[in-house]
């Protein structure tokens, strides 16, 4: 299987403290890959590094995608900005018409279709600050739909979301895979990862394992990830962190 992303000796630091440390791994193309690991393992930082949004990046990132769509955690989005559902979704075409250009009829048509696809017909003129968490996540997925990207990066897309919305959004993710798009998702729910994601990358600032989900999420690997994360907490400035596994 070809790789959509190749990471070689990738290190990402904040104030000289490594959040991702000497990571070498591949993300398969046209596949659904979950990035998992303990809290503070560098999962969200890794997504930002792939976009060039993280400071102090060392190593090599090779990406075959022509277009990349990114969905951050909702906590990072200011919902107080006075904007409608329709205009929020239309921002998915921002790179095509820019700040001073006008959306074309095809963009308006596609935005309407994307809103229908996420089950929000009739919400087009609603201000985003009047939506529930689940409704707003549907809006953000509609915006991703409009970007028509080869590589889709989603950071905790199901946090605090109702089960019906999770199921509906998973249908979209599976559709992207069927369309040969690469989807990389940061998740905490390991049961969902085992059920829905064929590929996984287990991170504890350093790579624990990457590959088929059943192998990556073995009991031994999860124990090792926890031990590595605890060791990093004790040795935040160290380049080589001792890891002691319980017998």
Describe the function of each predicted region.
Residues 51:
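Helix-to-loop junction immediately C-terminal to a conserved catalytic motif
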Residues 105-123:
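Conserved ABC ATPase "signature" region
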Residues 127-131:
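Conserved ABC ATPase signature
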Residues 152-156:
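Catalytic Walker B motif of ABC-type/P-loop ATPase nucleotide-binding domains
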Residues 187-188:
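H-loop/switch region of ABC-family ATPase nucleotide-binding domains
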Residues 197-213:
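H-loop (His-switch) and adjacent beta-strand-loop-beta switch element
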Residues 214-247:
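ABC ATPase nucleotide-binding domains
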